[in-house]
């Protein structure tokens, strides 16, 4: 059994849904793992991880609109405003999604996800 770990950062243009699929598969390509279980973890309280369709950009736009409607910025319900009107909504969105994913990995470089999916 082999265990390996890897840490990376991504730059974003603010709130949104971003793919890290390429970064994860690039790292897997450097490993000598024929099969296993990949755990992806984000150590942040106002960000999260999703596995979602990546073929139709409307899916990501619809998800973004849904979360904006479900948890709007600046809602007077929120007391926590110290880091801006979007911070508490980000914490709530993170609580509604996931901070960790477990994905089967095979063939050295491929996640066992359909080709239209992305992390």
Model-inferred region functions:
Residues 110-119:
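Single conserved hydrophobic/aromatic residue that forms the stacking wall/gate
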Residues 1-111:
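Active-site histidine-anchored catalytic micro-motif
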């Amino acid at each position: 059994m082999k265990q390996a770990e890897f840490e990376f950062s991504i730059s974003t243009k603010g709130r949104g849904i971003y793919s890290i699929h390429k970064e994860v598969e690039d790292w897997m390509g450097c490993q000598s793992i024929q099969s296993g279980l990949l755990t992806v973890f984000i150590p942040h309280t106002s960000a999260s991880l999703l596995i979602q369709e990546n073929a139709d950009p409307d899916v990501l736009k619809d998800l973004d609109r849904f979360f904006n409607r479900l948890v709007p910025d600046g809602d007077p319900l929120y007391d926590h405003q110290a880091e801006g009107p979007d911070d508490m909504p980000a914490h709530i969105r993170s609580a509604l999604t996931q901070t960790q994913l477990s994905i089967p990995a095979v063939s050295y470089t491929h996640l066992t996800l359909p080709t239209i999916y992305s992390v």
